[in-house]
């Protein structure tokens, strides 16, 4: 199989900038990963971003309960060391994934069980705020609120 695609080397000279559209959780996590590979990361969001964990127009799902399953929690902890402890100190609940919740499947509650994996129950507001605060501690990252993309 032949291809006309020829990869080119990324120029080493000059600053490299990543631009991320959106400061919701997906954009914040993308910006965090980009910060490891770019000299500057700019995040643009149309909303005013609150200084505290409060509702914002661009994240209407923020009032719903959120669960961060074990693998996701571990990945976030790797990106932001100490995140889990900080969230728990602010009211999030860390529990065994099998013991900390009940499952209703096809009209029947299933028995709890020890899964050996820790999941986190946390408000979307708190999770997004804590991730944004930690991301802004990185001098390579800037977030511009009230900016149309």
Regions found by a protein language model. Give the residues of each.
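Short beta-strand to alpha-helix junction loop
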Residues: 67-68, 114-133
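N-terminal Rossmann-like dinucleotide/flavin-binding domain of flavoprotein oxidoreductases
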Residues: 65, 76, 127-142
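N-terminal FAD cofactor-binding segment of flavoenzymes
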Residues: 33, 37, 52-102
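Domain-scale detector for complete catalytic domains at protein termini or as standalone homologs
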Residues: 2-13, 37, 85-86, 110-111
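N-terminal Rossmann-like FAD-binding beta1-loop-alpha1 element of flavoenzymes
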Residues: 7-48
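A short, surface-exposed helix-loop junction/capping segment
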Residues: 53-54, 108-115
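A conserved short coil-to-beta-strand element within the FAD-binding core of flavoproteins
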Residues: 145-149
């Amino acid at each position: 199989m032949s291809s006309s695609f020829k990869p080119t080397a990324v120029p080493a000279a000059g600053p490299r900038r990543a631009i991320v559209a959106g400061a919701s959780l997906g954009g914040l996590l993308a910006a965090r990963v980009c910060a490891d590979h770019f000299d500057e990361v700019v995040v643009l969001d149309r909303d005013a971003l609150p200084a505290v964990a409060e509702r914002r127009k661009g994240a209407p799902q923020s009032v719903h309960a959120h669960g961060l399953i074990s693998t996701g929690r571990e990945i976030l902890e790797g990106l932001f060391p100490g995140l889990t402890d900080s969230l728990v100190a602010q009211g999030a609940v860390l529990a065994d994934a099998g013991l900390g919740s009940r499952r209703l499947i096809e009209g029947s509650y299933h028995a709890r069980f020890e899964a050996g994996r820790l999941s986190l129950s946390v408000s979307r507001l708190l999770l997004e705020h804590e991730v944004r605060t930690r991301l802004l501690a990185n001098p390579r990252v800037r977030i511009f609120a009230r900016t149309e993309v």
